[in-house]
Amino acid sequence: MDITELLAFSAKQGASDLHLSAGLPPMIRVDGDVRRINLPALDHKQVHALIYDIMNDKQRKDFEEFLETDFSFEVPGVARFRVNAFNQNRGSGAVFRTIPSKVLSMEDLGMGEIFKKVSDVPRGLVLVTGPTGSGKSTTLAAMLDYINSNKYHHILTVEDPIEFVHESKKCLVNQREVHRDTHGFSEALRSALREDPDIILVGEMRDLETIRLALTAAETGHLVFGTLHTTSAAKTIDRVVDVFPAEEKSMVRSMLSESLQAVISQTLLKKIGGGRVAAHEIMIGTPAIRNLIREDKVAQMYSAIQTGGALGMETLDACLKRLVSKGLVSRESAREKAKTPENF
């Protein structure tokens, strides 16, 4: 069994991930649940060979030196995969996250008009947040695709690794992969400001320097899209501010209050009848929200989102209620994800 056959099988089953782990049969995650493939267990040598076959020399060297590595891999005609190779107590392991080869449009994903409005802003910071595997990359890809289809701009992305590949439609699109095309997010962002971009996508805002540079880029007239692993708008603001030392916090609040255009926090739910659907909390950078950020009154943000429906804002619970009433998700699924489960 070679790796391309396993990956083709995984993609055909609609799996989000393929897991290889020495001592166990291959497994796939379908609609959120991990299931075994009906194959014999793989030993360390087999897993090691499967992973090594698709690595280049640099990736092998990284894997040997750091005991884990990330890279992307494409099976032509099937899909691209984001790969993490690692070691565990029984030997080698790897996870292949499926990246659909086709960028889904906002229409495909059933995203509302507010996502177009957010994508149309000329400058500022847009954060798409949520836990790992909540579909952030898919949402961002749809937003970039909308810009790419409607505007004559330069889109520059910095990703680790590149997930969705965007063809240049009306826009010029340049995608840079960390460790392959640049040494890191902060290095790429520093030079991005000299590369005449209109839109910058920062795959992950992991550290102080990257967040600082993203804020600067947003302040200097670029539209910056970024991701964080936070689960709500309020937590997102806190997370960004908390990265900075005490003496800079008020300056960062001021920068955020000027440049933040939207925070979209999302989670994935199982759909009735199979598949998954995203639920969002949407906060827009209105004057009221900007004031709350500047004055460090993040706790009041939730009620501002609740009352901001006319401006396109929506709480997660309101979005979940809509999905339940449309018959897309069950009450039980909604209750699991809700901020106030007793409402379901």
Regions found by a protein language model. Give the residues of each.
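Short, flexible helix-loop junctions that flank or precede catalytic/ligand sites
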Residues: 1-344
